[in-house]
């Protein structure tokens, strides 16, 4: 058996091929797993669990079917869907996890997260993240009418795209010291995350021992998952 990890699908109505690929994944590979972990940015945007977007209800039903089949499903918030709440989690049968979670998997101690908190060189993003994660601001935003939230979200995405276009690729990647610090804080030799859209397996030293950072790919033109078994940790790309 295996435990599966995915991230950065950025589901939206404008990308039906990705949605179809995810549905096939849920009906196939996911049903064979010991557990499924979604490490953030499942959706391109999330403005509240009360958004009547049909895509959200379709995905909730599909994930719930996996959960009901006996495969526990877990979710860590990303930078795009950090407002996904308990209502949607309940509808989809997912368990919400904190932004950093340590798992004991087949004899390995593994830290999982979305990954945006590791990009500490991007001071502008980290300041923005700290602001939008303030509980009072989230409560205020979610109390706004839905049409207002949609306008704000669209403007924020446009601003983010413009800001990122002028940033170097290095700034938007993880900071190596932040990676080592997180792994040593949790006393792990394995880290799995997404966010950067740069799939790879990196070797490093943490806790004075060899360690590994596994980065999930985004679902743009193909699927990406990490498959952890008793024998191996594999980064796998597959066609939709």
UniProtKB/Swiss-Prot annotation:
Q: Does the keyword Manganese apply?
A: yes
What does the entry list as the binding residues for substrate? 79-80, 122, 160, 164, 167, 195
Q: Where does Mn(2+) 1 bind?
A: 8, 10, 41, 197
A Gene Ontology BP annotation from the UniProt entry: lipid A biosynthetic process
InterPro entries annotated for this entry?
Answer: Calcineurin-like_PHP_ApaH, LpxH-like, Metallo-depent_PP-like, UDP-diacylglucosamine_Hdrlase
Q: Per its UniProt entry, which superkingdom is the organism in?
A: Bacteria
GO CC terms for this protein? Answer: cytoplasm; extrinsic component of plasma membrane
The membrane topology of this protein is: Peripheral membrane protein
Q: Which UniProt keywords apply?
A: Cell inner membrane, Cell membrane, Hydrolase, Lipid A biosynthesis, Lipid biosynthesis, Lipid metabolism, Manganese, Membrane, Metal-binding
Q: Which family does it belong to?
A: Belongs to the LpxH family.
Q: What HAMAP family does its record include? A: LpxH
- Summarize the protein's role: Hydrolyzes the pyrophosphate bond of UDP-2,3-diacylglucosamine to yield 2,3-diacylglucosamine 1-phosphate (lipid X) and UMP by catalyzing the attack of water at the alpha-P atom. Involved in the biosynthesis of lipid A, a phosphorylated glycolipid that anchors the lipopolysaccharide to the outer membrane of the cell.
- Protein name, entry field: UDP-2,3-diacylglucosamine hydrolase
Biological source species: Escherichia coli O1:K1 / APEC
Lineage, please? Answer: Bacteria, Pseudomonadati, Pseudomonadota, Gammaproteobacteria, Enterobacterales
Its gene name is lpxH
